[in-house]
Design a protein with these regions (language model features):
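Acidic, polar low-complexity linker/tail segments
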Residues: 1-69, 150
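Phosphate/oxyanion-binding active-site loops and adjacent basic polyanion-contact surfaces
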Residues: 68-80, 130-143, 172-176
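Short beta-strand-loop
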Residues: 92-127, 209-214
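N-terminal accessory interaction module
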Residues: 26, 252-284
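Von Willebrand factor
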Residues: 119-159, 170, 203-210
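Surface-exposed acidic, glycine-flexible loop patches that form ligand/cofactor-binding
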Residues: 27-31, 86-90, 147-158, 185-191
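C-terminal helix of von Willebrand factor
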Residues: 208-210, 216-264
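VWA/integrin I-like adhesion module and closely mimicked acidic/polar interface patches used
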Residues: 169-221, 226-227
């Protein structure tokens, strides 16, 4: 049995199976002290249709004369609005850095929207960047966030997490992995706090396979830095931040894990941690 990322169902928010070893994260709404969060929206040309506002008319006559039109939200806006509203409750000061990435002719530019609150999110509009990128480069966005986090560390940030909204078409996967190796080394040295990244797929035709390639990478001494979600498939908001949940968090006083034949695979007597790790026998 190789590495497999299963579709989690309640009560799980994340599930990994590799050679019979299961790592399951229970659905848990974590509180992380000193957490500084950000949202980056894909600004590349492949996302142009997802930023387009569609018009709605009451009838054919209104459509013909172009009157009484109603602008509907684009594919990105409602997703970013609820993500922002939720993540602001996790952020240390309730302000999130929001920006477009993969902008400009090189696909490496960042267009900063600003630091936004999680209140009145329906008033925020996200029509896309001023200059769409001709390629989709994620590494510059990671560097932008890390540089931002370094400054926030002097103001009280003790942990970082950035969400990258995308259609999954990423052109610099090798650069992303190389830079993540640098981040992992700095985390081990203590020059950077613990950081996690979340890819959120939006729109039609999300390239989930490439998102999985990035998220399955493990870094020495750190493990996984990434997780990914498909926005339309998120049923519980806490699923979004499963990557922030760790073994130190407790969800119950105890419990046990049994297979389909009733055999006890693992027993937790004093506390049930939010992250469960156990072996599952072949055929179970």
């Amino acid at each position: 049995m190789g590495h497999k990322h299963e579709r989690p169902v309640e009560p799980f928010s994340d599930l990994h199976v590799e050679h019979g070893h299961v790592r399951a994260t229970l659905l848990h709404d974590p509180t992380v002290e000193g957490l500084d969060m950000a949202i980056y929206m894909d600004g590349s040309a492949s996302m142009s249709g997802d930023y387009a506002y569609k018009k709605k008319y009451n009838n054919l006559i209104d459509w013909f004369f172009g009157r009484n039109e109603v602008n509907l939200p684009n594919n990105v806006e409602p997703q970013v609005q609820w993500i922002l509203e939720y993540l602001a409750t996790k952020d240390r000061n309730g302000l999130l850095r929001v920006a477009y990435w993969a902008c400009g002719a090189s696909g490496k530019d960042i267009e900063l929207v600003g630091e936004l609150k999680g209140t009145d999110v329906q008033s925020y509009k996200f029509p896309g960047p001023n200059f769409q990128g001709k390629s989709t480069n994620l590494a510059p966005a990671l560097k932008d966030y890390v540089n931002y986090l370094r400054k926030q560390m002097h103001l009280g940030a003790r942990r970082g997490c950035a969400v990258f909204v995308t259609d999954g078409e990423i052109h610099d996967e090798d650069d992303v992995k190389r830079y993540c190796n640098e981040i992992a080394k700095e985390m081990q040295k203590g020059s950077l706090p613990k950081i996690n990244f979340i890819l959120v797929g939006v729109g039609e035709g999300v390239n989930e396979e490439q998102m999985e390639e990035i998220c399955h990478e493990e870094y020495p001494g750190i493990g996984h830095l990434w997780c990914h979600r498909i926005a339309e498939e998120i049923n519980e908001v806490a699923e979004l931040v499963a990557v922030l949940v760790d073994e130190s968090m407790t969800v119950a006083g105890g419990g046990r894990i049994v297979d389909d034949k009733g055999k006890v695979l693992k027993l937790y007597e004093s506390r049930l941690p939010a992250v469960l790790e156990f072996q599952i026998p072949e055929g179970a």
